[in-house]
Regions:
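Amphipathic alpha-helical scaffolding segments comprising HEAT/armadillo-like alpha-solenoid repeats
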Residues: 25-39, 60-72, 92-108, 130-142, ...
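Generic amphipathic, hydrophobic interface segment in small proteins and small subunits
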Residues: 37-49
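Structural detector for internal amphipathic alpha-helices that build alpha-solenoid repeat scaffolds
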Residues: 3-28, 46-60, 69, 80-94, ...
């Protein structure tokens, strides 16, 4: 697999997943496991960002603890990539969001980077529609001092979660 870069291998993994080639995806995943781990710990934030994006492309659901490192990273770009990966991995697995709910709440409410805040809010849509999450999002949506896009995203996700909670 050394003839491929991590980005190319991740793109190939995404293609395998889209085509339902589970055996090929598993083989590629096994071959790139160590490289993804090493990239997630790299000194360069761009390499770390690529590693966290690759977690979703490779469908590495067993690497949620590694994903936590990305959510706690000093770089907003890395945190954003980790959030994008979490959103993708949690679409069919709300438990993934639930594992990180308190951290996502903190990021949605207080992260210094507006894009990271919005991505954290978007991740919350895939979780269980709990009242504390809905209250947090409604509070963000109603805060005129917050960024307009953050408020709009929070309002949209809160509305979706309320609908889902009533459908149960």
């Amino acid at each position: 697999m050394s003839e491929l870069t991590l980005g190319q291998a991740a793109k190939l993994a995404e293609e395998y997943a889209a085509r339902g080639l589970a055996k090929e995806l598993a083989s590629l995943r096994a071959a790139w496991d160590d490289e993804v781990e090493a990239a997630a710990r790299h000194a360069d934030y761009r390499v770390r960002s690529q590693a966290y994006r690759a977690l979703a492309q490779f469908r590495y659901r067993q690497k949620l603890e590694l994903l936590r490192r990305g959510l706690d990273d000093e770089s907003p770009g890395v945190r954003g990539s980790a959030l994008i990966a979490l959103e993708a991995l949690s679409r069919d697995h709300p438990g993934d969001v639930n594992k990180f709910r308190s951290l996502l709440h903190e990021m949605a409410a207080r992260d210094a980077n507006v894009a990271v805040r919005r991505l954290a809010i978007v991740c919350l849509k895939n979780g269980t529609p709990l009242p504390d999450t809905i209250r947090l999002l409604e509070g963000i949506a109603g805060n005129d001092e917050d960024d307009a896009e953050v408020r709009r995203t929070a309002r949209s996700v809160a509305t979706l979660l309320v609908k889902r909670s009533r459908a149960k």
